[in-house]
Amino acid sequence: MALAVFVCGVIASRPAGATDTTPLTGDIATAARAVEAMANPSAVNPLVEFPADFNEVTNRKPVVVTTPDGTKRAIDPAGGCSGPAGDTEWDFGPGCRAHDLGYDLLRYAEHKGRPLNQEARKVLDARLARDMHAQCDINPRGHGTRCHATAQLYAAGLEFNSWRQRWGPPGHEPVLAWGFGSAVVVFLLLARLPGLPRRKEGDREPEPSDTPRPRVTNDRYATFLRLAALGLVVLSQSLLTVLHWAGVSANWLWLLTWALQAIPVFYFAGGHANLTSWHAVQADHGGYGRYLSARISWLLRPVLAFVLAWLVLPLPLELLDVDKSRVEMFGRLIAYPLWFLGLYLVAVAATPVMAWLHRHARLVTPVALVAVMIVVDALRISLHWRTGGYLNLVLGALLLQQLGFHYADGSLHRISRKVLGALALTAVPVLLALITFGGYPRTMMTLPGEGSSNLSPPTVCLLVLGLAQISLVLLLRPRVTGWLAGHRQWRVVEYARSAPMTVYLGYLTVLAAVIGVLGLLDAPAAFDWVATRPRWLTVLVLLLLPVLLVFHRFERNAALSPSRTRETHRTRLAVTLGAGYGVLGVLGFVVTGFAGAAGTLLVFKVDPLQNLIHLLLGWYLLHTAHAGTCHGRRPWLLTALACVPPLLVLEPTGAMVVLHGATIAAALLAAIPKQYQARTTEHRQPRPALQHP
């Protein structure tokens, strides 16, 4: 476990490599020739190959020395070996100083705007390895074997560090943040290993046998809608990809996206489930902490398994010499759809507040959300306001969830079929008018070859389409409900219902393997591609089965552990921080991918290692609230510890300092034991907890 997590941390900390393959020119070409001269020393002065402004740009003053073999070497007098023994007793110093100057050439090229390719750093590292072994032959000092072993150790450490930096320009990295962060990842996982204390007896609420628990109302049609919408998202992405391979033009595919875009229906049906669960928790005398810990824990668990798997996967891919640019594209491709889950976590967390608004302002709330979305969309277009797109994502999810609330309380059932039909039919001319005269994109999903879509970022067109889809599903409700009354049909739905996230994440896994590993999108030949390569069909089937089994195990185990804990201020703090950091981790991977490149999520500067820590911290805090261990001191001390690595980066942003500093302060306060906590627990009248619906 610890070894796997360490590998995750190493891979997550790796920066993205350079991918520019255009010919070198000017000072960059001169720097490349200088590197070549450094890697192949001769009797010629290598400084004649250096760029004219090298000393000024790098603030270095290289000198030339003559080695015992008669070659001239350019060195950095201030350099030296960075190993634990320094230049060593065999004097590896000249080779290390020449190597340091070669690294300065790599930094010079990066400063000029065009990093040299991987081969430049590889030849410099190989030159240093040969120099150290040559020094052992020239001056073994009576310990030739030990000298060669030391040289080999230095060379291995050098190669590992270059591999970790993707053989790109060497830079000053937050090694302390990386090492501390990897340790925190290990601690967060070890805190959940079997055999460790889970909860105190005083934290568990007894379950009286004579007190019945309230049951969640089961709307078969709403359950079917959630699963069908999720399945349609899967099928639509696969279908559009296959059609693109077949060479179908985007001029035809855009119409298909109108019928296949099912995300609005999913959030609509999810709103019904969220409101029903919240009401059930309230009826069971529970609160926000119990609701959120039960509702989000089962979502984050399979997501965490998915992320850990895909953080480790680039290692064997690179060992198999898979093209680096493809691995990086692969990481971003499989991480991007996680926004769908991250946004759903936001909607789940906002349910209690939105339910209060639904109770006190039933009609005003959705109308206000629509108005704000229209204003934000107009500002986004006119001011090129990128953040407006993110804001509309959240507002759109909350609006569709709010409509799901109206379905849950029966309000939408009172709308006549004629009105629903008119709304559905009116959407078509409205969409055509918005696309023709409003300048909106014509596609409702991202398509290859299309510059933009109404999904990324979400626009008014997606809102109109969502309202039309909801009208259609309400029209179909009586007929589909009758069909779902059949025993066989409902058994299929119940089986899929037990692990909906497993289906979604399993699909992402297989899609990523097809596109990223096999590189199908790089060379779409023809529609008969699958038929001409039957061996890949076998590979995909063998890949799909274990993936689904593993993810299903994570999700099934999470669903079988209902909450039986008392709810306190610590519980509510744990679930609030857990949900927030869980969303930050999931959406952070959407921005950065798994390839090691940093990115910006709103005002937060994130990288894959920070994303992993945030996701693990969110999962851990939600688990402590669910299991009742958040009343102890250890979870809060570990929470404070987990917030330290983001503060150790070279240039932490103000937003990250405020977020993690405030979390550390809150965690340390929560770690202080209360004087009368035991007495409060002893006199509290326990109530039965609600099992997750």
Segments from the language model and where they lie:
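Alpha-helical transmembrane segments of multi-pass membrane proteins
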Residues: 6-15, 232-243, 311-315, 581-593
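Hydrophobic alpha-helical transmembrane segments of polytopic
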Residues: 2, 222-232, 256, 263, ...
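Sec/Tat-exported extracytoplasmic proteins
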Residues: 85, 100-110, 128, 132-139, ...
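Alpha-helical transmembrane segments and their immediate juxtamembrane cytosolic regions
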Residues: 206-566
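Membrane-interface extramembranous regions
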Residues: 566-690
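Membrane-interface capping segments at transmembrane-helix boundaries
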Residues: 191-203, 479-483, 550-563, 672-684
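Individual transmembrane alpha-helices with interfacial aromatic-anchor signatures
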Residues: 170-172, 337, 532-539, 653-662
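Extended terminal accessory/targeting regions
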Residues: 1-210
